[in-house]
Amino acid sequence: MAQNNVLVLGAPHSGKLRASAIIGAGFSGDGDFSGSHSGLIFKIKRQTKYFKHDLSIMVDEYPEKRTITPSWEHLNAWSDEFMSEDMEELRRALDGIVFCLNLDDKATMKDLEPTIGVLEKIYESLGGAEWAGFFAIVGVSSSEDNENHAIVEDAATIRGFEYINLEEEGQNEFRDKLGIDRLVELFDTHDWSDIETSEDDGFAARKRKMAESMCQRLLDDDEKDMSSENGVNDVNVEEFENVIEKLKQARIKAESMEGAERNEYAQQVMEDVLSYL
């Protein structure tokens, strides 16, 4: 199964499509989302300042029919299938789960404790604390009353789940992002299985020019301090110190080389330097 998969799960009207759209799913005008959302898959391309990657957002819903009032028992039945041997490939391919709750729904609040109990089972089936993925509970509501959000947050965090109140904005007193920004940040900071670096072309060019200039010293007898090159301010100080140390060791090794061997070695070192910058 392809890498970079996230499951968005919840009962009807729990904000699954809203969460998917925030992550990056696009909904065309031809789509009919009035029925069950089970089986919807959105394949998107995400890009941040540092990387870009493909992502599959897989949406699922319980119960199977919208004519049935959802309850924690339906989630439990869903989890039995999810934890079955037939679903092992899916579980292994998941990078994360976003579980959505509609806090305006009285049944949702009534079923909160057994619902989170089922989520704990699902989490353990993925490997628990050893699982490299993320598991977030996302709450939506139309009410300005935050009491239900506080109740769900307490129940979630005490069991080790992150809770995101999708109606919040800005930052908390610890300068942590809230609401939509936190959901996006969760995806931006995850260690995805399959990514490509995404850097500004101008910055990348400056890095290569600086690396080429530094590595030219391996071919020269110039003892000028290599840390004086223009462009040093473009990189982290600690990273740059690692680069300088690597170049010093490379200079010593290059002294025993001549001609083509020395040129080839300088090229190899330059590529290594680029990985540091």
From Swiss-Prot:
Listed GO biological process terms: vesicle-mediated transport
Domain of life: Eukaryota
Keywords: Chromosomal rearrangement
Pfam family, one: Adaptin_binding
InterPro entries, per the entry: Irc6
Any one GO MF annotation of this record: protein-macromolecule adaptor activity
Family as reported in the entry's similarity comment: Belongs to the IRC6 family.
Functional note: Involved in gross chromosomal rearrangements (GCRs) and telomere healing.
Protein name from the UniProt record: Increased recombination centers protein 6
